[in-house]
Regions:
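Alpha-helical bundle segments that constitute or directly flank the non-heme di-iron/ferroxidase center
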Residues: 2-32, 86-111
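Preference for long, well-ordered alpha-helical segments
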Residues: 53, 95-139
């Protein structure tokens, strides 16, 4: 039997995805050489931050903790010791793909989710999918 996901779990996962995306960008930004790629990444960081602020305004009770932050930061630093823009674009694409899959899975399991929260989750998916498309030329 599949357990129903509650609203707090969905908010937590949404914030976790946004935070992980922003942390990854923060660690990679100074390693990007291509100016166009840098602008795409900066724009993505802003979109994630704006959506995170909307979530916090709508759900001020939401706990904002990033799961596995240390592991993410360590992995990024290790993978970018010897890297180039194509590898960075690949890492960001893979992270965005994982976020889309996770959010889709969660939403498919929940039928009675608050419509505002569903809208934010859909926004997160849309932002991530657009970002993936923009990154393709750098792979």
């Amino acid at each position: 039997m599949v357990m129903k996901m509650n609203e707090e779990t969905c908010i937590e996962e949404l914030l976790n995805g946004l935070n992980m995306g922003m942390i990854a960008i923060d660690h990679l930004l100074d390693k990007i050489e291509n100016e166009k790629l840098r602008e795409i990444v900066i724009h993505q960081r802003k979109n994630y931050g704006d959506l995170k602020n909307k979530v916090h305004q709508t759900y001020p009770h939401a706990e904002d903790k990033t799961k596995q932050k240390f592991m993410l930061e360590s992995m990024i630093e290790m993978k970018t010791l010897l890297t180039d823009d194509a590898k960075i674009a690949k890492m960001l694409t893979e992270g965005s793909n994982q976020s889309v899959k996770t959010m889709t899975h969660l939403l498919n399991r929940e039928q009675d989710i608050d419509q505002t929260l569903k809208s934010y989750c859909d926004d997160f998916e849309d932002i991530s999918k657009r970002y993936i498309e923009e990154l393709k030329e750098f792979l």
